[in-house]
From Swiss-Prot:
Protein name in UniProt: tRNA(Met) cytidine acetate ligase
InterPro entries with a match to the protein in the record: Rossmann-like_a/b/a_fold, tRNA(Met)_cyd_acetate_ligase
GO biological process: tRNA modification
UniProt keyword Ubl conjugation, yes or no: no
Amino acid sequence: MRVLGIVVEYNPFHFGHLHHLEEAKKLINPDYVVAVMSGNFCQRGEPAIVNKFARTEIALKNGVDVVFELPVVYAIQDAGGFALGSVGVLDRTGVVTDIVFGSESGDVTFLRKVANLLTNQTPEFEKTFKRHLKMGYSYPNARKYALMDVLSNDVEKLSKSNDILGIEYIKALIKYSSDIQPHVIKRIGADYNDEQFKGKFSSASAVRKAIKENKFEQTKEALPEWTFKILEREFSEGRGPVFLEYFDFVIAMFRKLKREDFERIYSFNEGLDLRFYESARESGNLQDFVERVKAKRFTYSRIRRAIFHVLFDMEKSFVELSNEKGPQYLRVLGFTKRGRELLKAMKKNSKVPIISTASLYRNVLEEAKKKIAEGKVSWEIDESLYIWQFERDLLASDIYTFLYPNKFQRKAGMDFEYKVIEMLG
Protein backbone atom coordinates (compact mmCIF):
# COMPACT_ATOMS: atom_id res chain seq x y z
CA MET A 1 0.00 0.00 0.00
CA ARG A 2 1.34 3.41 -0.99
CA VAL A 3 0.14 6.42 0.96
CA LEU A 4 1.02 9.90 -0.24
CA GLY A 5 1.64 12.55 2.41
CA ILE A 6 1.50 16.28 1.65
CA VAL A 7 2.02 19.36 3.82
CA VAL A 8 -0.42 22.18 3.13
CA GLU A 9 -1.91 25.44 4.34
CA TYR A 10 -4.49 25.96 1.58
CA ASN A 11 -4.88 29.63 2.42
CA PRO A 12 -6.86 29.36 0.23
CA PHE A 13 -6.73 26.27 -2.05
CA HIS A 14 -6.08 27.53 -5.61
CA PHE A 15 -5.24 26.03 -9.02
CA GLY A 16 -1.55 25.86 -8.17
CA HIS A 17 -2.42 23.61 -5.22
CA LEU A 18 -4.66 21.48 -7.44
CA HIS A 19 -1.81 21.09 -9.94
CA HIS A 20 0.56 20.03 -7.14
CA LEU A 21 -1.95 17.48 -5.84
CA GLU A 22 -2.66 16.00 -9.28
CA GLU A 23 1.03 15.84 -10.22
CA ALA A 24 1.89 14.23 -6.87
CA LYS A 25 -0.73 11.55 -7.52
CA LYS A 26 0.70 10.90 -10.99
CA LEU A 27 4.20 10.60 -9.55
CA ILE A 28 3.34 8.21 -6.69
CA ASN A 29 0.11 6.53 -7.89
CA PRO A 30 -0.99 6.24 -4.25
CA ASP A 31 -3.83 4.26 -2.78
CA TYR A 32 -4.61 7.16 -0.41
CA VAL A 33 -3.67 10.82 0.12
CA VAL A 34 -3.06 12.24 3.60
CA ALA A 35 -2.62 15.97 4.21
CA VAL A 36 -1.28 17.67 7.32
CA MET A 37 -2.65 21.20 7.31
CA SER A 38 -2.00 24.31 9.39
CA GLY A 39 -5.02 25.11 11.55
CA ASN A 40 -6.29 28.65 12.00
CA PHE A 41 -2.85 30.30 11.80
CA CYS A 42 -0.18 29.96 9.13
CA GLN A 43 3.59 29.81 8.92
CA ARG A 44 4.12 33.40 7.77
CA GLY A 45 2.59 34.59 11.05
CA GLU A 46 -0.90 35.31 9.74
CA PRO A 47 -4.42 34.07 10.45
CA ALA A 48 -5.92 31.81 7.79
CA ILE A 49 -8.47 33.60 5.63
CA VAL A 50 -11.16 31.10 6.71
CA ASN A 51 -11.15 28.55 9.51
CA LYS A 52 -9.55 25.12 9.44
CA PHE A 53 -12.82 23.20 9.07
CA ALA A 54 -13.85 25.15 5.94
CA ARG A 55 -10.38 24.60 4.46
CA THR A 56 -10.58 20.89 5.35
CA GLU A 57 -13.87 20.65 3.48
CA ILE A 58 -12.21 22.25 0.44
CA ALA A 59 -9.28 19.80 0.63
CA LEU A 60 -11.57 16.78 0.75
CA LYS A 61 -13.66 18.09 -2.16
CA ASN A 62 -10.48 18.40 -4.24
CA GLY A 63 -9.03 14.91 -3.74
CA VAL A 64 -7.47 14.53 -0.27
CA ASP A 65 -8.61 11.47 1.73
CA VAL A 66 -7.65 12.43 5.30
CA VAL A 67 -6.74 15.82 6.78
CA PHE A 68 -4.81 16.13 10.05
CA GLU A 69 -4.22 19.41 11.86
CA LEU A 70 -0.66 20.62 12.28
CA PRO A 71 -0.49 21.68 15.96
CA VAL A 72 -0.23 25.46 16.23
CA VAL A 73 3.08 25.22 18.10
CA TYR A 74 4.61 24.06 14.78
CA ALA A 75 2.34 25.98 12.39
CA ILE A 76 3.70 29.36 13.56
CA GLN A 77 7.39 28.49 13.70
CA ASP A 78 10.11 29.08 11.14
CA ALA A 79 10.70 26.56 8.35
CA GLY A 80 12.60 24.20 10.67
CA GLY A 81 9.93 23.99 13.36
CA PHE A 82 7.15 23.86 10.77
CA ALA A 83 8.83 20.88 9.10
CA LEU A 84 9.46 19.06 12.40
CA GLY A 85 5.75 19.21 13.14
CA SER A 86 4.38 18.41 9.71
CA VAL A 87 6.78 15.56 8.95
CA GLY A 88 6.28 14.36 12.52
CA VAL A 89 2.53 14.07 11.94
CA LEU A 90 2.97 12.20 8.64
CA ASP A 91 5.58 9.85 10.10
CA ARG A 92 3.48 9.10 13.18
CA THR A 93 0.50 7.96 11.16
CA GLY A 94 2.56 4.81 10.65
CA VAL A 95 1.15 4.40 7.13
CA VAL A 96 2.50 7.25 4.97
CA THR A 97 5.11 5.95 2.52
CA ASP A 98 5.95 9.01 0.42
CA ILE A 99 6.02 12.79 0.80
CA VAL A 100 5.83 15.09 -2.22
CA PHE A 101 6.48 18.82 -2.01
CA GLY A 102 6.87 21.70 -4.41
CA SER A 103 10.35 22.86 -5.35
CA GLU A 104 11.60 25.74 -7.46
CA SER A 105 14.70 23.75 -8.46
CA GLY A 106 13.06 20.35 -8.87
CA ASP A 107 16.36 18.83 -7.68
CA VAL A 108 15.76 16.44 -4.77
CA THR A 109 19.37 15.18 -4.89
CA PHE A 110 20.69 18.68 -4.19
CA LEU A 111 18.13 19.21 -1.41
CA ARG A 112 19.23 15.93 0.21
CA LYS A 113 22.86 17.06 0.01
CA VAL A 114 22.11 20.35 1.78
CA ALA A 115 19.91 18.63 4.39
CA ASN A 116 22.72 16.22 5.23
CA LEU A 117 25.21 19.10 5.48
CA LEU A 118 22.94 20.97 7.89
CA THR A 119 22.24 17.84 9.95
CA ASN A 120 25.92 16.92 10.23
CA GLN A 121 27.46 20.39 10.28
CA THR A 122 31.14 20.66 9.45
CA PRO A 123 33.41 22.99 11.46
CA GLU A 124 33.84 25.07 8.28
CA PHE A 125 30.08 25.58 8.00
CA GLU A 126 29.61 26.43 11.70
CA LYS A 127 32.41 29.01 11.59
CA THR A 128 31.00 30.67 8.46
CA PHE A 129 27.46 30.64 9.85
CA LYS A 130 28.50 32.35 13.11
CA ARG A 131 30.44 34.96 11.16
CA HIS A 132 27.35 35.93 9.17
CA LEU A 133 25.24 36.12 12.35
CA LYS A 134 27.78 38.50 13.89
CA MET A 135 27.50 40.64 10.75
CA GLY A 136 23.85 41.24 11.70
CA TYR A 137 22.09 38.91 9.27
CA SER A 138 18.87 37.18 10.31
CA TYR A 139 19.16 33.46 11.13
CA PRO A 140 17.79 32.26 7.75
CA ASN A 141 19.99 34.65 5.78
CA ALA A 142 23.10 33.83 7.83
CA ARG A 143 22.50 30.14 7.14
CA LYS A 144 21.90 30.78 3.44
CA TYR A 145 25.13 32.75 3.03
CA ALA A 146 27.10 30.13 4.98
CA LEU A 147 25.77 27.42 2.66
CA MET A 148 26.63 29.55 -0.36
CA ASP A 149 30.19 29.89 0.90
CA VAL A 150 30.55 26.15 1.56
CA LEU A 151 28.75 24.82 -1.53
CA SER A 152 29.80 27.62 -3.93
CA ASN A 153 27.51 26.26 -6.68
CA ASP A 154 23.71 26.14 -7.07
CA VAL A 155 23.38 29.17 -4.80
CA GLU A 156 20.09 30.28 -6.37
CA LYS A 157 18.45 27.13 -5.00
CA LEU A 158 19.08 28.33 -1.45
CA SER A 159 16.99 31.49 -1.69
CA LYS A 160 13.61 30.13 -2.81
CA SER A 161 10.95 29.46 -0.19
CA ASN A 162 9.88 25.99 -1.39
CA ASP A 163 13.45 24.71 -1.70
CA ILE A 164 14.26 26.04 1.78
CA LEU A 165 11.22 24.25 3.18
CA GLY A 166 12.06 21.09 1.24
CA ILE A 167 15.50 20.99 2.86
CA GLU A 168 13.81 21.23 6.27
CA TYR A 169 11.41 18.39 5.40
CA ILE A 170 14.34 16.13 4.55
CA LYS A 171 16.16 17.17 7.75
CA ALA A 172 13.04 16.23 9.72
CA LEU A 173 12.87 12.84 7.98
CA ILE A 174 16.48 12.26 9.07
CA LYS A 175 15.71 13.31 12.67
CA TYR A 176 12.75 10.92 12.94
CA SER A 177 14.67 8.10 11.20
CA SER A 178 11.63 7.94 8.95
CA ASP A 179 11.10 5.46 6.14
CA ILE A 180 9.03 8.05 4.22
CA GLN A 181 10.61 8.77 0.83
CA PRO A 182 10.84 12.42 -0.34
CA HIS A 183 9.96 13.51 -3.89
CA VAL A 184 9.69 16.93 -5.51
CA ILE A 185 7.51 18.56 -8.14
CA LYS A 186 8.84 21.61 -9.92
CA ARG A 187 6.71 24.56 -8.86
CA ILE A 188 4.78 26.45 -11.54
CA GLY A 189 2.81 29.67 -11.53
CA ALA A 190 3.38 32.82 -9.52
CA ASP A 191 6.03 33.06 -6.82
CA TYR A 192 4.77 32.36 -3.30
CA ASN A 193 5.29 36.01 -2.29
CA ASP A 194 3.96 37.53 -5.53
CA GLU A 195 0.89 39.62 -4.67
CA GLN A 196 0.08 40.56 -8.26
CA PHE A 197 -3.07 38.81 -9.49
CA LYS A 198 -2.20 36.78 -12.61
CA GLY A 199 -5.33 34.80 -13.39
CA LYS A 200 -5.41 31.02 -13.12
CA PHE A 201 -2.00 30.54 -11.51
CA SER A 202 -2.05 33.47 -9.10
CA SER A 203 -0.40 32.85 -5.73
CA ALA A 204 -2.35 32.48 -2.49
CA SER A 205 -0.90 35.86 -1.45
CA ALA A 206 -2.37 37.46 -4.58
CA VAL A 207 -5.75 35.84 -3.95
CA ARG A 208 -5.82 37.08 -0.36
CA LYS A 209 -4.83 40.58 -1.48
CA ALA A 210 -7.65 40.63 -4.05
CA ILE A 211 -10.14 39.55 -1.37
CA LYS A 212 -8.84 42.24 0.99
CA GLU A 213 -9.40 44.80 -1.79
CA ASN A 214 -13.04 43.63 -2.18
CA LYS A 215 -12.32 41.87 -5.49
CA PHE A 216 -13.56 38.44 -4.41
CA GLU A 217 -15.45 37.86 -7.67
CA GLN A 218 -12.19 38.28 -9.60
CA THR A 219 -10.61 35.37 -7.69
CA LYS A 220 -12.90 32.90 -9.49
CA GLU A 221 -10.16 32.74 -12.16
CA ALA A 222 -7.65 31.36 -9.65
CA LEU A 223 -9.87 29.12 -7.52
CA PRO A 224 -11.40 25.69 -8.19
CA GLU A 225 -15.20 25.67 -8.06
CA TRP A 226 -15.49 24.20 -4.56
CA THR A 227 -12.97 26.63 -3.10
CA PHE A 228 -14.95 29.59 -4.39
CA LYS A 229 -18.28 28.16 -3.21
CA ILE A 230 -17.08 27.42 0.31
CA LEU A 231 -15.30 30.77 0.67
CA GLU A 232 -18.46 32.49 -0.56
CA ARG A 233 -20.50 30.63 2.09
CA GLU A 234 -18.07 31.47 4.90
CA PHE A 235 -17.89 35.14 3.91
CA SER A 236 -21.67 35.48 3.58
CA GLU A 237 -22.15 34.01 7.07
CA GLY A 238 -19.53 36.34 8.56
CA ARG A 239 -16.87 33.73 9.37
CA GLY A 240 -14.30 35.42 7.19
CA PRO A 241 -12.24 36.80 5.70
CA VAL A 242 -9.89 37.15 8.67
CA PHE A 243 -6.76 39.29 8.24
CA LEU A 244 -3.75 40.18 10.37
CA GLU A 245 -4.85 43.82 10.53
CA TYR A 246 -7.76 42.74 12.75
CA PHE A 247 -5.28 42.02 15.57
CA ASP A 248 -4.61 45.64 16.60
CA PHE A 249 -5.88 44.75 20.09
CA VAL A 250 -2.61 42.95 20.86
CA ILE A 251 -0.86 46.33 21.22
CA ALA A 252 -2.85 46.97 24.41
CA MET A 253 -1.86 43.52 25.67
CA PHE A 254 1.82 44.16 24.94
CA ARG A 255 1.68 47.44 26.88
CA LYS A 256 0.76 45.47 30.00
CA LEU A 257 3.93 43.38 29.76
CA LYS A 258 7.38 44.09 31.13
CA ARG A 259 10.47 43.36 29.09
CA GLU A 260 11.20 40.23 31.15
CA ASP A 261 7.71 38.90 30.31
CA PHE A 262 8.75 38.70 26.65
CA GLU A 263 12.00 36.93 27.52
CA ARG A 264 10.22 33.72 28.62
CA ILE A 265 8.44 33.43 25.26
CA TYR A 266 9.85 31.41 22.36
CA SER A 267 11.67 33.36 19.60
CA PHE A 268 12.56 36.29 21.87
CA ASN A 269 16.31 36.71 21.73
CA GLU A 270 18.84 38.99 20.04
CA GLY A 271 17.09 42.05 21.52
CA LEU A 272 13.64 41.31 20.07
CA ASP A 273 12.13 41.63 23.56
CA LEU A 274 13.32 45.24 23.90
CA ARG A 275 12.03 46.16 20.44
CA PHE A 276 8.59 44.71 21.27
CA TYR A 277 8.51 46.46 24.66
CA GLU A 278 9.45 49.88 23.25
CA SER A 279 7.45 49.65 20.00
CA ALA A 280 4.22 48.75 21.83
CA ARG A 281 4.43 52.10 23.61
CA GLU A 282 4.85 54.05 20.38
CA SER A 283 2.51 52.27 17.94
CA GLY A 284 -1.12 53.03 17.15
CA ASN A 285 -1.84 49.87 15.17
CA LEU A 286 -0.28 46.51 14.34
CA GLN A 287 1.14 47.55 10.97
CA ASP A 288 2.96 50.48 12.59
CA PHE A 289 4.17 48.17 15.37
CA VAL A 290 5.65 45.64 12.92
CA GLU A 291 7.46 48.40 11.02
CA ARG A 292 8.95 49.80 14.24
CA VAL A 293 10.19 46.35 15.33
CA LYS A 294 11.66 45.54 11.89
CA ALA A 295 15.44 45.36 11.73
CA LYS A 296 18.04 43.68 9.53
CA ARG A 297 18.05 40.51 11.60
CA PHE A 298 14.28 40.38 12.20
CA THR A 299 12.26 39.41 9.11
CA TYR A 300 8.61 40.44 8.83
CA SER A 301 7.53 36.80 9.13
CA ARG A 302 9.57 36.31 12.30
CA ILE A 303 8.03 39.42 13.88
CA ARG A 304 4.50 38.32 13.00
CA ARG A 305 5.12 34.81 14.36
CA ALA A 306 6.53 36.32 17.57
CA ILE A 307 3.31 38.33 17.99
CA PHE A 308 1.33 35.08 18.08
CA HIS A 309 3.91 33.39 20.30
CA VAL A 310 3.09 36.04 22.91
CA LEU A 311 -0.64 35.87 22.28
CA PHE A 312 -0.70 32.07 22.69
CA ASP A 313 1.78 32.10 25.62
CA MET A 314 4.31 29.91 23.82
CA GLU A 315 6.89 29.34 26.58
CA LYS A 316 10.39 28.58 25.31
CA SER A 317 10.67 25.36 27.31
CA PHE A 318 7.52 23.78 25.84
CA VAL A 319 8.27 24.84 22.26
CA GLU A 320 11.81 23.47 22.50
CA LEU A 321 10.43 20.24 24.00
CA SER A 322 7.89 20.05 21.16
CA ASN A 323 10.72 20.32 18.62
CA GLU A 324 12.69 17.65 20.45
CA LYS A 325 9.86 15.13 20.96
CA GLY A 326 7.56 15.90 18.02
CA PRO A 327 3.75 15.94 17.87
CA GLN A 328 2.14 14.03 20.73
CA TYR A 329 -1.13 13.24 18.94
CA LEU A 330 -2.82 13.14 15.53
CA ARG A 331 -5.85 15.45 15.32
CA VAL A 332 -8.29 14.39 12.59
CA LEU A 333 -10.07 17.32 10.92
CA GLY A 334 -11.83 15.39 8.17
CA PHE A 335 -11.93 12.35 5.91
CA THR A 336 -13.66 10.85 2.89
CA LYS A 337 -15.20 7.40 2.58
CA ARG A 338 -11.83 6.08 1.39
CA GLY A 339 -10.12 8.00 4.16
CA ARG A 340 -12.22 6.22 6.75
CA GLU A 341 -10.71 2.91 5.57
CA LEU A 342 -7.21 4.34 5.99
CA LEU A 343 -7.97 5.64 9.49
CA LYS A 344 -8.81 2.07 10.53
CA ALA A 345 -5.33 1.00 9.41
CA MET A 346 -3.79 3.96 11.24
CA LYS A 347 -5.37 2.94 14.53
CA LYS A 348 -3.28 -0.23 14.33
CA ASN A 349 -0.08 1.43 13.11
CA SER A 350 0.06 4.98 14.49
CA LYS A 351 2.94 5.98 16.78
CA VAL A 352 0.82 8.39 18.86
CA PRO A 353 -2.88 8.51 19.83
CA ILE A 354 -5.49 9.78 17.36
CA ILE A 355 -7.97 12.48 18.46
CA SER A 356 -11.24 12.63 16.52
CA THR A 357 -13.45 14.35 19.11
CA ALA A 358 -11.81 17.41 20.67
CA SER A 359 -13.79 17.25 23.91
CA LEU A 360 -12.40 13.77 24.59
CA TYR A 361 -8.70 14.69 24.31
CA ARG A 362 -8.05 13.89 27.99
CA ASN A 363 -9.92 10.59 27.68
CA VAL A 364 -7.75 9.73 24.66
CA LEU A 365 -4.66 10.44 26.77
CA GLU A 366 -5.86 8.23 29.63
CA GLU A 367 -6.64 5.41 27.20
CA ALA A 368 -3.17 5.80 25.65
CA LYS A 369 -1.52 5.60 29.09
CA LYS A 370 -3.49 2.44 29.82
CA LYS A 371 -2.40 0.81 26.53
CA ILE A 372 1.23 1.72 27.21
CA ALA A 373 1.04 0.28 30.74
CA GLU A 374 -0.47 -2.97 29.41
CA GLY A 375 2.23 -3.25 26.73
CA LYS A 376 -0.28 -3.02 23.89
CA VAL A 377 1.58 -0.13 22.23
CA SER A 378 5.15 1.16 22.33
CA TRP A 379 4.23 4.84 22.26
CA GLU A 380 6.35 7.39 24.10
CA ILE A 381 3.92 10.11 25.18
CA ASP A 382 4.89 13.11 27.31
CA GLU A 383 1.65 13.72 29.23
CA SER A 384 2.24 17.39 30.06
CA LEU A 385 3.42 18.14 26.51
CA TYR A 386 0.39 16.39 25.00
CA ILE A 387 -1.95 18.58 27.07
CA TRP A 388 0.07 21.76 26.43
CA GLN A 389 0.14 21.22 22.65
CA PHE A 390 -3.57 20.46 22.37
CA GLU A 391 -4.68 23.27 24.67
CA ARG A 392 -2.68 25.73 22.55
CA ASP A 393 -4.70 24.53 19.55
CA LEU A 394 -7.91 25.20 21.49
CA LEU A 395 -6.71 28.67 22.52
CA ALA A 396 -5.70 29.54 18.95
CA SER A 397 -9.21 28.66 17.74
CA ASP A 398 -10.87 30.74 20.47
CA ILE A 399 -8.78 33.79 19.61
CA TYR A 400 -9.30 33.27 15.87
CA THR A 401 -13.11 33.26 16.07
CA PHE A 402 -13.04 36.54 18.01
CA LEU A 403 -11.87 38.20 14.77
CA TYR A 404 -14.82 37.04 12.64
CA PRO A 405 -16.52 39.93 10.80
CA ASN A 406 -19.93 38.87 12.19
CA LYS A 407 -19.95 39.55 15.94
CA PHE A 408 -22.64 36.89 16.46
CA GLN A 409 -20.21 34.23 15.17
CA ARG A 410 -17.44 35.15 17.61
CA LYS A 411 -18.13 32.76 20.46
CA ALA A 412 -15.38 30.48 21.76
CA GLY A 413 -15.37 26.68 21.54
CA MET A 414 -15.00 26.13 17.78
CA ASP A 415 -13.18 22.85 18.35
CA PHE A 416 -16.03 21.50 20.46
CA GLU A 417 -18.81 22.85 18.24
CA TYR A 418 -17.52 21.49 14.92
CA LYS A 419 -17.48 17.76 14.30
CA VAL A 420 -14.92 16.02 12.12
CA ILE A 421 -15.79 16.71 8.47
CA GLU A 422 -17.04 13.41 7.02
CA MET A 423 -17.43 13.35 3.24
CA LEU A 424 -18.86 9.91 2.67
CA GLY A 425 -20.85 10.50 -0.51
